[in-house]
């Protein structure tokens, strides 16, 4: 095994020390050779790969966090059918709800009947999937700071010499640099906060943001100079539906404009005069300046600062971590109260023997998902001690009057749909009762209204109907896939879900089952 003469030349201690150093030298040589041959295994390389992997995961999560057409909208004139043939239908909704609340997919997966969910998206990937990163602007060149990775919207913040040419839907940024790098210096955005939905975005104009050198030819000259910033947004998409009016437009417009303190000009593309008029009271509080229907402008409007698009990160929620001073839905609701003169800030607190009657508003639906026994529900609620109001808001409803009526209530109740959006006018500590129809849409219903209610300081209850409470039982046998396997309809796409579970389903509440929900609401009103 070893040379005895060599061994006799050294003491046992020296032999051990020599052996130790020999092993150490051999180890160092082996590691050096290994690293030389396999540089990818260098510790720094491993660290770098880990960082790149994490960044890739984060980016992928952001790109996948797209919200699709939600089941709450009344499918009328503003609800667009599937945008194009060949649309992918692999998932109905994906939404980034942050770490503080479950995502839409998590919410849907919490429903054991919901084994498959579908999504209705354009075959052309939305900007979220096309973007590879958040743009890091070059201040020297005057590049915009663009965020194309948000879950719901894309936007660019621009500073410098900004010129808007409406007839080409182009925002020019004129750089002081003599030459611009040969690489493409243009960006595009559709300024509406539902970017993952092909049905919504098909009616939203695409705008180009183009960086040019000041000495280039054909740069438009300013005809109107403005000393205030501007915000570009679209009133296309699903505007006209109450849920989308707030989630896609009013909440993002509010949160995007707050930093300007009223000194900002709104530029509305895809301008709909009736829509702006409906919410004129809100716009007049957000800006001291007129709204420009930018598509019709022949003048070249110039600004030194602009936000092209709206900042929206969560469904029907303001993500406080993304805005200065902890801006939240609580601030937005205070804004609504002051605008519409909503007097009540807190719901009633019931006391034993107090003789008080909490007011309950039942949202009535005229066409789809109707409550066919509204009268019976109303009578039962009154026997339990409620004062009951049955109401239905339409396009012609006076918004101020209706907001004040909702604010006078302590409980808002209705079948899943856009009418529940009126919870924004409720006082704090009020209760939202959402009746969820058949169809495996529980998770979607919670994302639309259940999760946002928490940020609004509203208590939330839900009542999930059974097959015997659905009008579908009159159309299909109980062993039909409509009842046994809603996921099979999800696989067929949004049209199948809408047709069967939303357009053709009405609800007849089992009074015995539902009574406990109304009793629970009363108990909640006894404690604040």
What residue spans do the PLM features occupy?
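The feature primarily captures lumenal catalytic ectodomains
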Residues: 2-528
């Amino acid at each position: 095994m070893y040379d005895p003469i060599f061994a006799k030349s050294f003491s046992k201690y020296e032999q051990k020390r020599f052996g130790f150093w020999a092993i150490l030298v051999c180890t160092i040589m082996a590691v050096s050779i290994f690293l030389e041959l396999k540089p990818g295994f260098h510790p720094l390389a491993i660290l770098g790969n880990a960082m790149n992997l994490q960044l890739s995961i984060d980016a992928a999560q952001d790109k996948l966090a797209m919200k699709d057409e939600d089941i709450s909208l009344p499918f009328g004139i503003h609800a667009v059918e599937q945008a194009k043939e060949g649309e992918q239908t692999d998932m109905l909704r994906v939404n980034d709800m942050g770490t503080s609340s479950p995502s839409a997919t998590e919410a849907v997966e919490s429903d054991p009947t919901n084994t498959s969910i579908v999504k209705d998206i354009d075959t052309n990937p939305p900007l979220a999937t096309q973007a590879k990163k958040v743009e890091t602007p070059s201040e020297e060149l005057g590049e915009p700071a663009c965020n194309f990775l948000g879950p719901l919207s894309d936007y660019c913040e621009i500073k410098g010499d900004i010129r808007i040419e409406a007839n080409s839907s182009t925002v020019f940024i004129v750089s002081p640099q003599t030459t611009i790098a040969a690489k493409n210096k243009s960006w595009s955005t559709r300024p509406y906060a539902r970017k993952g939905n092909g049905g919504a975005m098909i009616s939203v104009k695409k705008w180009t943001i183009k960086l040019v050198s000041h000495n280039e030819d054909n740069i438009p000259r300013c005809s109107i100079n403005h000393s205030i910033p501007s915000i570009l947004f679209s009133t296309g998409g699903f505007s006209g539906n109450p849920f989308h009016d707030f989630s896609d437009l009013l909440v993002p417009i509010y949160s995007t404009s707050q930093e300007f303190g009223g000194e900002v000009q709104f530029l509305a593309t895809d301008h709909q005069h009736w829509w702006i008029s409906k919410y004129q009271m809100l716009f007049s509080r957000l800006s001291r300046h007129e709204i420009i229907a930018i598509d019709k402008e022949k003048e070249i409007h110039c600004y030194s600062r602009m936000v092209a698009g709206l900042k929206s990160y969560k469904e029907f929620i303001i993500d406080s971590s993304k805005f200065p001073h902890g801006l939240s839905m609580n601030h937005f609701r205070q804004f609504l109260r002051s605008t519409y003169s909503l007097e009540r800030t807190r719901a009633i607190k019931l006391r034993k023997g107090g003789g008080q009657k909490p007011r309950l508003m039942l949202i009535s639906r005229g066409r789809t998902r109707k409550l066919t026994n509204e009268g019976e529900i109303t009578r039962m609620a009154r026997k339990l001690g409620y004062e009951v109001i049955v109401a239905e808001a339409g396009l012609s409803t006076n918004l101020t009057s209706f907001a004040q009526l909702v604010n006078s209530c302590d409980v808002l109740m209705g079948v899943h749909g856009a009418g529940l959006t009126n919870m924004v006018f409720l006082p704090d500590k009020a209760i939202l009762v959402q009746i969820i129809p058949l169809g495996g849409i529980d998770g979607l219903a919670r994302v639309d209204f259940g999760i946002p209610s928490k940020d609004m300081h509203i208590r939330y209850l839900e009542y999930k109907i059974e097959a015997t409470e659905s009008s579908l039982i009159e159309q299909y046998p109980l062993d039909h896939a409509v009842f046994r396997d809603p996921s099979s309809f999800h696989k067929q796409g949004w049209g199948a879900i809408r047709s069967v579970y939303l357009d053709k389903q009405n609800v007849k509440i089992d009074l015995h089952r539902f009574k406990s929900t109304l009793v629970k609401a009363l108990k909640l009103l006894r404690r604040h």
